[in-house]
């Protein structure tokens, strides 16, 4: 046990942690030359293409140092803000962390939030400055930032390059020297912390865990504490690039368990595994249910695919327990599901995986967040969907979720960023200068304002330099109203949204203009209206396509022409009564892209 080192890598998106992990694997000869490819640990094609890590991964390396063999378990974590619960569980399974900072970009918001998480878990932190081979690297300035953040001596900061492999030996040596061996009692009742699960179509759900106390052996009868379910450990083993079965896994080590579990609901990240015969008295602290933050309706384009969509979502859920869904129906789109996601990136990824892995064409409605409605009778109702709002006469007030956000940016962009946050009803809490030209701004913002396009706008006004991190803070009463879109007087439920009263008129007007561009012209006029309750706040009209019926009259009496025009008008009127307006898929998504 004294030769085991468990560590994770903390970094902001794009600071090169997956590449550096590749170098560590190559250097310790964990991965043979023929298996080597970029981002070895990222299994999904989607992860490689986008260059992001979505799920946590784990891999075991062996390293000889001063004549002794050490086992290093690297637990790779996602860097994106949507997946911060996965990061927190991975961090809890480690004793040390490599803090990777890009020598060209410096410290970013995500780095800081994950670093605080590591410090709370008492991890030994090893600062590494990556990408020092870049021509745009600023090693001295970035070193100043790291020293200021960690308060460590300058000579402790390792310089490395994931691309050239420079500094990799120093990193491995430092891990062995500085990261403490896992603490734990091999004789105590079994306690294993689950930090991830993956779905294998042949063997069911495979849980990855770290043994905190005790020893787990093949064939043991075990119990998952949070769900209370019992299983037999058909196979346990360690994680190299592939799984290597072992007879037992001892205290402090990281491994996997296969026990024929069918659904991901039964394996919760953060849960504890213990023996049925000699159970641990309590679970490992820190387990929490992940609550979805963003909700959207997902509908099949062809309504006959409803059952296929259900099956696809269930399969996705096997691999991604944070995805929730329940059936709902819409007059405009037919039957579909109301899905809950951790954030916008998570939503995009689920959509893309539905398309790639299951060939499902889906329509997604406007994402919204959950609100708490207080009725005049004193009841509290949680609403995920604007259609679920009770009658306005019964509502006392509505609470909406607020987040606490921190934005790190160059001082050049402070003005535009503050304007953006104020436009999103943000409240400035404080601003702190990290170094001469970098500042951290703290805001309280309503989650509903951020959910659509805040991140994209932040990136574009700061030329990609600003970084953003947030966590849910609390619920606060707000003046919200349900905005309906009517086409020829008929409400289209899939386009309804909840907006703040102050922004509703401009939002309604922009929405109508956008829909006017996207809905194709018909044989009759189409009125697009935005309404709050019975009050119309904006209107646009799509003019009818019409034939020149008087073309065949040359000269002659005006009454002849009038007769033909009246006849056409009658026909158009009749068409309008029975005609329906097709809303194209583009129009549902356009709402997300209103500027």
Curated annotation (Swiss-Prot):
Reaction catalysed by this chain? GTP + H2O = GDP + phosphate + H(+)
Q: Does the keyword Plastid apply?
A: no
Classification via InterPro entries? EF-4, EFG_III/V, EFG_V-like, EFTu-like_2, LepA_C_sf, LepA_CTD, LepA_IV, P-loop_NTPase
Q: How the protein sits in the membrane? A: Peripheral membrane protein
- Gene3D superfamilies linked to this entry: 3.30.70.240, Elongation factor 4, C-terminal domain, Elongation Factor G (Translational Gtpase), domain 3, P-loop containing nucleotide triphosphate hydrolases, Translation factors
Domain (tr-type G) ranges: 2-183
Please list every transmembrane segment annotated in the UniProt record, as residue ranges: none
Q: What does this protein do?
A: Required for accurate and efficient protein synthesis under certain stress conditions. May act as a fidelity factor of the translation reaction, by catalyzing a one-codon backward translocation of tRNAs on improperly translocated ribosomes. Back-translocation proceeds from a post-translocation (POST) complex to a pre-translocation (PRE) complex, thus giving elongation factor G a second chance to translocate the tRNAs correctly. Binds to ribosomes in a GTP-dependent manner.
What protein is this chain from? Elongation factor 4
> What are the leading ranks of the lineage?
Bacteria, Pseudomonadati, Bacteroidota, Bacteroidia, Bacteroidales
> What gene is this protein a product of?
lepA
């Amino acid at each position: 046990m004294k030769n085991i080192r468990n560590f994770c890598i903390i970094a902001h998106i794009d600071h090169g942690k997956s590449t550096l992990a590749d170098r560590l694997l190559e250097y310790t000869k964990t991965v043979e030359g023929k298996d080597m490819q970029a981002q070895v640990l990222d299994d999904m094609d989607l992860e490689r293409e986008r260059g992001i890590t979505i799920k946590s991964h784990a891999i075991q390396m062996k390293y000889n140092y001063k004549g002794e063999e050490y086992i290093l378990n690297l637990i790779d974590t996602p860097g994106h803000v949507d997946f911060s619960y996965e990061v927190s569980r991975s961090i809890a399974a480690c004793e040390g962390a490599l803090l990777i900072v890009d020598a060209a970009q410096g410290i970013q918001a995500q780095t800081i939030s994950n670093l605080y998480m590591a410090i709370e878990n008492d991890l030994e932190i090893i600062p590494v400055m990556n990408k020092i081979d870049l021509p745009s690297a600023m090693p001295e300035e970035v070193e100043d930032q790291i020293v200021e953040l960690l308060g460590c001596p300058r000579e402790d900061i390792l310089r490395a390059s994931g691309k050239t492999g420079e500094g990799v030996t120093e990193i491995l040596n430092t891990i062995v020297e500085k990261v403490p061996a896992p603490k734990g009692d091999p004789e105590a009742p079994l306690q294993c912390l689950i930090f991830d699960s993956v779905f294998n179509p042949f063997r069911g759900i495979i849980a990855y865990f770290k043994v905190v106390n005790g020893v787990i052996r093949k064939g043991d009868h075990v119990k998952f504490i949070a769900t209370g379910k019992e299983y037999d450990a058909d196979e346990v083993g360690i994680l190299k690039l592939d799984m290597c079965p072992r007879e037992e896994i001892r205290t402090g080590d990281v491994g996997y368990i296969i026990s024929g579990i069918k659904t991901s609901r039964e394996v919760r990240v953060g849960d504890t595994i213990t023996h049925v015969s000699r159970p641990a008295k309590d679970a490992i602290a820190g387990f929490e249910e992940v609550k979805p933050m963003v909700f959207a309706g997902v509908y099949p384009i062809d309504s006959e695919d409803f059952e296929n969509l259900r099956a696809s979502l269930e399969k996705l859920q096997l691999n991604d327990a944070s995805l929730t869904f329940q059936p709902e129906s819409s007059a405009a789109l037919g039957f579909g599901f109301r899905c809950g996601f951790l954030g916008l990136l998570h939503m995009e990824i689920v959509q893309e995986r539905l398309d790639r892995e299951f060939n499902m064409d889906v329509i997604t409605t406007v994402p919204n967040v959950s609100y708490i409605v207080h009725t005049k009778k004193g009841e509290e109702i949680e609403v995920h969907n604007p259609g679920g709002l009770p009658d306005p006469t019964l509502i006392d007030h509505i609470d909406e979720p607020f987040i606490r956000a921190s934005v790190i940016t160059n001082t050049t962009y402070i003005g535009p960023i503050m304007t953006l946050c104020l436009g999103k009803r943000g409240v400035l809490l404080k601003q702190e200068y990290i170094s001469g030209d970098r500042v951290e701004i703290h805001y309280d913002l309503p989650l509903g304002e951020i959910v659509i396009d805040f991140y994209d706008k932040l990136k574009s006004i700061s030329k990609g330099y600003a970084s953003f991190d947030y966590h849910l803070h609390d619920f606060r009463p707000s003046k919200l109203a349900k905005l309906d879109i009517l086409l020829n007087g008929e409400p289209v439920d899939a386009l309804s949204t909840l907006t703040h009263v102050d922004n509703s008129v401009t939002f309604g007007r922009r929405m109508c203009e956008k829909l006017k561009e996207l809905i194709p012209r018909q044989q009759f006029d189409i009125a697009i209206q935005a309404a709050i309750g019975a009050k119309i706040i904006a209107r646009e009209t799509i003019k009818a396509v019409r034939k020149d019926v008087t073309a065949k009259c040359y000269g002659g009496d005006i009454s002849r022409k009038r007769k033909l025009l009246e006849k056409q008008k009658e026909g158009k009127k009749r068409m309008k009564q029975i005609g329906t307006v097709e809303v194209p898929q583009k129009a549902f998504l356009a709402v997300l892209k209103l500027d």
